[in-house]
Amino acid sequence: MLLETQDALYVALELVIAALSVAGNVLVCAAVGTANTLQTPTNYFLVSLAAADVAVGLFAIPFAITISLGFCTDFYGCLFLACFVLVLTQSSIFSLLAVAVDRYLAICVPLRYKSLVTGTRARGVIAVLWVLAFGIGLTPFLGWNSKDSATNNCTEPWDGTTNESCCLVKCLFENVVPMSYMVYFNFFGCVLPPLLIMLVIYIKIFLVACRQLQRTELMDHSRTTLQREIHAAKSLAMIVGIFALCWLPVHAVNCVTLFQPAQGKNKPKWAMNMAILLSHANSVVNPIVYAYRNRDFRYTFHKIISRYLLCQADVKSGNGQAGVQPALGVGL
């Protein structure tokens, strides 16, 4: 089947985003795995975020391409393709929320931080968050789906019979996942509240940090440490802001589709494609932010690329090691 120009451009851009997402986020995982200075509880949550972004490139984007082209498949196969990206999105949101709480504890209760936040606890939290993400993302399999309307409009059965369970449906997102689920449960219930909580947390972090910096009795070492923590919080708040900017357009389109059905039916395909591309492009951004904002990540990225891709000798930093400060706590 020949693709229209618009569809061909969409597929090409999705493939570019997928390649960049996988490459960049595998690099993040490798950096944390190989550099001792990057192995902190905060970065374990960032690895969880990177793992979700790798899965976006490997699975969610190919699934999105399949759905955009409207191939015919059985209902539950199409529903799985549609729901898988919801699992990854929810995992990303939970990982960002965990990072925000982690930074809040680091700045607001610094003396208890190391005893409260350990690597083992961080890994346990990550496991729980992924289980919750799968539960939320796969909720349509419990019945909140469009099976009745989809099978009433099936194209053809698998074996030429009229058996509804074997019915082939045109695999489009809106054919299998109801907008009521996407807006009321997914957006209003599972996306917007964590984003608002993160906004409150980061505002609180900056207020507390600024108040502490104004204390004249603060020792030079404590002041430097606090400035690093503020720098880290700014970097992570930037990641949350970019996430919101990338994902809110597609949720806005879903809201229009649900609350203004007439306009929703007539929405241009290119607008929906652009919103989807923007949401997927978010998976490319985080490694760029890490490299730009953090010396340890930047050095380790350079070291990995030089050693394994360019087959060059190890890169040496000024002191012969991959930075000396905790990740995301180093000023540039």
From Swiss-Prot:
Cysteine pairs bridged by disulfides in the record: C78-C171
GO cellular component entries: glutamatergic synapse; plasma membrane; presynapse; Schaffer collateral - CA1 synapse
SUPFAM superfamilies (alphabetical): Family A G protein-coupled receptor-like
Carbohydrate attachment residues: N153, N163
Regions crossing the membrane: 9-33, 44-67, 79-101, 122-144, 179-203, 236-259, 268-291
InterPro entries the record matches: Adeno_A2B_rcpt (IPR001435), Adenosn_rcpt (IPR001634), GPCR_Rhodpsn (IPR000276), GPCR_Rhodpsn_7TM (IPR017452)
Domain of life according to the entry: Eukaryota
Pfam families to which the protein is assigned, alphabetical: 7tm_1
Keywords tagged on the record: Cell membrane, Disulfide bond, G-protein coupled receptor, Glycoprotein, Lipoprotein, Membrane, Palmitate, Receptor, Transducer, Transmembrane, Transmembrane helix
Membrane topology: Multi-pass membrane protein
Entry binding sites for adenosine: E174, N254, S279, H280
An individual GO BP term: positive regulation of vascular endothelial growth factor production
SMART domains: 7TM_GPCR_Srsx
Lipid attachment locations (S-palmitoyl cysteine): C311
Extracellular side of membrane: 1-8, 68-78, 145-178, 260-267
A GO molecular function held by the record: G protein-coupled adenosine receptor activity
Subcellular location per the Swiss-Prot or TrEMBL entry: Cell membrane
Cytoplasmic side: 34-43, 102-121, 204-235, 292-332
PANTHER family xrefs: ADENOSINE RECEPTOR A2B, OLFACTORY RECEPTOR AND ADENOSINE RECEPTOR
Stated family: Belongs to the G-protein coupled receptor 1 family.
Functional summary from the UniProt entry: Receptor for adenosine. The activity of this receptor is mediated by G proteins which activate adenylyl cyclase.
Protein's recorded name: Adenosine receptor A2b
